[in-house]
Amino acid sequence: MHRGRSASARQERDFRALMDLAHGFMASQVLFAGCALRVFDAAALGPVDAAALARSSGLSPRGTRLLLDACAGLGLLRRRRGAGPRGPAYTNSPLASTFLVAGSPLSQRSLLLYLAGTTYLCWGHLADGVREGRSQYARAVGVDADDPFTAIYRSEAERLLFMRGLQETWSLCGGRVLTAFDLSPFRVICDLGGGSGALARMAARLYPGSEVTVFETPDVVAAARAHFPPPADEDGAEPRVRFLSGDFFRSPLPPADLYVLARVLHDWADAACVELLRRVRGALRPGGAVLLVESVLSPGGAGPTRTLLLSLTMLLQARGRERTEAEYRALTARAGFSRLRLRRPRGPYHAMMAARGGGAGARSDGGGGDATSQTGSGTGSEVGAQD
């Protein structure tokens, strides 16, 4: 009898765990809908009730009440005790106040909207992606493109949403990866595929003695200049960052002491990564180095779970995968770099630095591998990016 009861209790626990996994997409959609409908922005102004929010936002009263209750159940909102004539009132939880309100310094709203409108749709075709071994943009968003960024940047609105999402990611954890190593000896820094320039501007603030350049595609550079003006520091000065446009698989790369590749290599297969690293090494000055920012798998590739899921995202949205430290060490060595070192700052990303070295791996031409065009900033769905 005791064994039977234990087995039954274990089965109940396993079934609950199974249902939590099966229903996980529902929780994601509650989060996404709350952001899209600006529920958390409304609650930031004061307690909200379903009837008033529905009326002011043009929503159905029934749907609004159900969504607010679900947000409260997930810990995104707090349902106040007691109910007035229009039903219960809701306020933001600390999590929502910090990460889900559009005006918060650490808001991740744009990132979540990007996940909802692109990554979530691709994940609906995971079985197809596993069968075919290729991205699922054609099924998910109707764009059948060899270059993943053609799909991500399928409209100017989507381009800006993606760039804002990356900017939000770096606002949360950019400083940690940029201070994992002391970058002050590097006087000229180039952020390859640096998007809006958020990480580059952070580097310029942290290392005021360095000149920082963002190398991006022409369309991204134009969008960065038009829509992402540099914030002034406390003394009113703007961090000095310049933008150069080009294709990092084809165009000449500017000379630098340090190249930063943040969430870039995970987009690409090994051959393209080696080709890009060789191009970077060819542009580095003597004594230079490359800083890689990635979510690194544990030895053997068995975890962490979040990084394993990100690797599937790369199957569905790009051509690459997440890798172990040993795999990054092998890639950099094939490109001629030496002494790869890994640091694990608090947060979702790891920082790796490899020295330019003096071997024969450098090559300054832009062809080879399976690289056909520049990806720009990593597709990382960072996914928030929580550990």
UniProtKB/Swiss-Prot annotation:
Tissue: Expressed predominantly in the pineal gland (at protein level). Very low expression, if any, in the retina.
Region feature (Disordered): 354-387
Keywords tagged on the record: Lipid metabolism, Melatonin biosynthesis, Methyltransferase, S-adenosyl-L-methionine, Transferase
Induction, as annotated: Exhibits very subtle night/day variation, if any.
EC number(s) from the headed UniProt entry: 2.1.1.4
InterPro entries for this protein: COMT-like, O_MeTrfase_dom, Plant_O-MeTrfase_dimerisation, SAM-dependent_MTases_sf, WH-like_DNA-bd_sf, WH_DNA-bd_sf
Positions of S-adenosyl-L-methionine binding: Y153, W170, E216, G246, D247, F248, R263
GO molecular function list: acetylserotonin O-methyltransferase activity; protein dimerization activity
Biased composition (Gly residues): 356-370
Catalyzed reactions: N-acetylserotonin + S-adenosyl-L-methionine = melatonin + S-adenosyl-L-homocysteine + H(+)
Chain's role: Catalyzes the transfer of a methyl group onto N-acetylserotonin, producing melatonin (N-acetyl-5-methoxytryptamine).
Known partners and oligomeric status: Homodimer.
Protein name, as recorded: Acetylserotonin O-methyltransferase
Originating organism: Mus musculus
